[in-house]
Swiss-Prot record:
Belongs to the universal ribosomal protein uS2 family. The gene is rpsB. Keywords: Ribonucleoprotein, Ribosomal protein. CDD domains: RPS2. Residues 234-264 have a biased composition (Acidic residues). It holds the Pfam family Ribosomal_S2. Coiled coil: none annotated. It comes from Symbiobacterium thermophilum (strain DSM 24528 / JCM 14929 / IAM 14863 / T). One of its GO terms (cellular component) is cytosolic small ribosomal subunit. GO terms for molecular function: structural constituent of ribosome. HAMAP family: Ribosomal_uS2_B. This is Small ribosomal subunit protein uS2. SUPFAM superfamilies: Ribosomal protein S2. One of its GO terms (biological process) is translation. It comes from the Bacteria.
Length: 264
């Protein structure tokens, strides 16, 4: 029994890694083979590691923990927002402000400002402002919403994080590790798995691959919080696994940031 099948992974292109010249040797154990200059990820390992990550996230959610979804690259933005909202968790999908976690007290002040701006819009006080003043406040609100909208309800640090492409999100990963917050991540062949607590070997560039794996993490949160099994469990026959394996073989700094934000 597994929470994800090799067929799902293959169809989403999870097995495609980066070019062989762009790799991290530490990912060698997760690589199945090489095809036309591209590394092919071992999906049998991905299946097992998705399940390990799923169980860890489910238990964290069952214990009342908060999971922060992080993915700012274009291919991940929609999936991160949609799946985090679906499971009622927080997310960062635009820009990671340096110190977002390690200087969280300052971030909370910016979140409070965002909430304040949302509350005054449309009030009597708002109607007394000039058009120019209203425009300035709306511009300020839009910028805060863009960067902090996904965490404006987050009153304290998260208990766990799910990261898409830890190499790109290296500042976030550094802050998470400094704070001792466990990390679950989609780790492609050019990433360092040693920085991640729960590695999910997989393609972090394809939209379908990112969506599939992110949705499984969201399912784990929902199951943990509600006690409802939302996972699409699969009981695969050995012949099916062999067939899919064959298919796989043939497949081809906060202050500076805030100052910059205000200056824009």
């Amino acid at each position: 029994m597994s929470v994800i099948s090799m067929k799902q992974l293959l169809e989403a292109g999870v097995h495609f890694g980066h070019q062989t010249r762009r790799w991290n040797p530490k990912m060698k154990e997760y690589i199945f083979t090489e095809r036309n200059g591209i590394y092919i990820i071992d999906l049998q390992k991905t299946v097992r590691m998705v399940e390990i990550a799923y169980n860890a996230v489910r238990q964290m959610a069952a214990d009342g923990g908060k999971i922060l979804f992080i993915g700012t690259k274009k291919q991940a933005q929609d999936a991160v927002r949609e799946e985090a909202e679906r499971c009622g968790m927080f997310y960062v999908n635009q820009r990671w402000l340096g110190g977002m976690l390690t200087n969280f007290e300052t971030i909370k002040k910016r979140i409070a400002r965002l909430n304040e701006l949302e509350e005054i819009e449309g009030t009597e006080y708002w109607s007394k402002l000039t058009k120019k003043e209203q425009a300035q406040l709306l511009h300020e609100k839009e910028k805060l919403e863009k960067n902090l909208g996904g965490i404006k309800g987050m009153k304290s640090l998260p208990d766990m994080a799910f990261v898409i492409d830890p190499r790109r999100e290296r500042i976030a990963v550094s802050e998470l590790r400094k704070l001792g917050i466990p990390i679950v991540a989609i780790v492609d062949t050019n990433c360092d798995p040693d920085e991640i607590d729960y590695v999910i070997p997989g393609n972090d560039d394809a939209i379908r691959a990112v969506k599939l794996l992110t949705s499984k993490i969201a399912d784990a949160v929902i199951e943990g919080r509600q006690g409802v099994d939302t996972s699409a469990t699969v009981d695969e026959e050995e012949a099916e696994v062999a067939e899919e394996t064959e298919s796989m073989e043939s497949a081809e700094d906060l202050d500076a940031d805030l100052i910059e934000e205000e200056a824009e």
